[in-house]
Each structure stands twice: as structure tokens, then as C-alpha cells.
Amino acid sequence: IRGLTQASANAQDGISCVQTAEGALNEVHDMLQRMNELAVKAANGTNQEEDRSYIQSEVDQLITEIDRVSTTTTFNEKMLLDGTFQNEELQVGAEGVAGNQIRISISSISSDTLGVKDLEVDGPDGSKAKTAISTIKNAIKTLNKQRSDLGAIQNRLEHTIKNLDNVVEN
């Protein structure tokens, strides 16, 4: 029974880890949404080149912040979003058989892997900004895929905990 109780606690740790990553991905999503808003603004023909340069400054700051989040998001001193959190095993059963482990992998989420590292919205016309809009949309799709994968893992862990708690109780 103690082994099963610990397995349940391990699964709960896994949920906490996933929630930490998800919280950071949520922030990155918000930054990408803001970048999209800025790109749409920069694409407007009423802007001057100087206006677009100011918009570019904010975009550059958002890119820097995405990378900061990528390199500083941790759980129990393990980096989560820099691409090194791969095939981490959670022991969710009392025995060491293969079916009692759940693996978690989190892709690198940085301005580079999202394709926005060199995003440009400045210039004399809105052409760079128009290109940036589709680049940002693709980045959001990539991010949403990772968020979906993490959500599925969290759901699986929640069901695992319910089952383990039921076994312990009975």
C-alpha cells in the first residue's frame, strides 16, 4: 500500500511539473498574441517607417522575453522548456514493470524553435509585417500542439491518481 501511495504522489508531482510548463507556455502564447497584434498594426499602410521601428522595438522585447522564459522555467531544478526535458519517467505503480511508468517530454520552446527569432515588422512599408503575421500564426500552432500534448499527459496522470487511490482504498 505504501508503494501505491508513493506512486500516487509521484503522479501528483508529474501534474505539478506539467502545470509549471503549461503556465510558462501560457505566457509565451500571450506574447505571441501580442506580437501578432503588433504585426497587424505595423502592416497598416497609414504607418510611417518611424512608427514601424517603434513597433519593432516592442516585438524585439517580446522575443527576448520568450527566450528568457525558455531558459528559466524549471521544476525541481530541471529545465522544462529548453529542450532537455526528454523522456523523463514517472514511476506511477508499485512495481518496476514498464506499464508502471509514464514518460514526459517537452519540446524546446524558444524564439528560434518557434520561428520568430528574427521576426521583422519594420521597414518603409508593411511587407515585412505581413510576412510576420503568418510566421506568428505558425508559431502559435506549434505552441498549441505542445500545450495539447501536456494537457493529455495531465489528464492521464489525473486518471492514474484516481485509479491508484481507488486501489489503495479497497
Predicted feature locations:
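Primary detection of the long, small/polar-rich alpha-helical "axial" segments characteristic
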Residues: I1-N170
